[in-house]
A protein has these predicted regions:
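A generic structural signal for alpha-helix starts
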Residues: 3, 33, 75-76, 111
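A short, structure-level motif marking secondary-structure boundaries and short turns
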Residues: 33-36, 64-67, 109
Length: 128
């Protein structure tokens, strides 16, 4: 019934989570050792992001989250995102929030961040 479906779609949360994903999330939150390691990794890697940004004259918005927001003022942030995607690295442009120079970048493992830094360094040099 289209009317009932429409009503249910208006009532549901914007991001549906199935029961398996919900159980996995609860289990992950109970794994305090994993959480501790993840928080430590994010903290250390966030410092590396800050150093990379400083070395490349980019502004990183202060954060305590599992991602950083980097201001690529003077560059075409969307073009950077596209070039990263072409290399298999996904970042999120914040154009929808009227932040055309900002990319949201998830903090990964050190090896993942190393790869991002290397690829991004080459892209920035190409775009100068």
């Amino acid at each position: 019934n289209k009317e009932i479906t429409s009503l249910l779609n208006r009532l549901r949360a914007p991001f549906n989570v199935n029961i398996v994903a919900l159980a996995a999330a609860v289990a992950a939150l109970d794994d305090t050792e994993f959480l501790k390691k993840t928080v430590e990794n994010n903290s250390k890697e966030r410092e590396r992001y800050a150093a990379f940004c400083k070395d490349h004259n980019l502004f990183m918005i202060p954060s305590k989250a599992n991602f950083v927001a980097v201001d690529f003022k003077g560059y075409d942030a969307q073009a950077i995102a596209d070039k990263l995607l072409h290399q298999g690295i996904i970042v999120r442009p914040l154009l929808g929030y009227k932040l055309q120079d900002i990319l949201r970048i998830s903090i990964g493992k050190p090896s993942e961040n190393d790869r991002l830094f290397n690829v991004l360094d080459k892209i920035l040099k190409e775009m100068k």
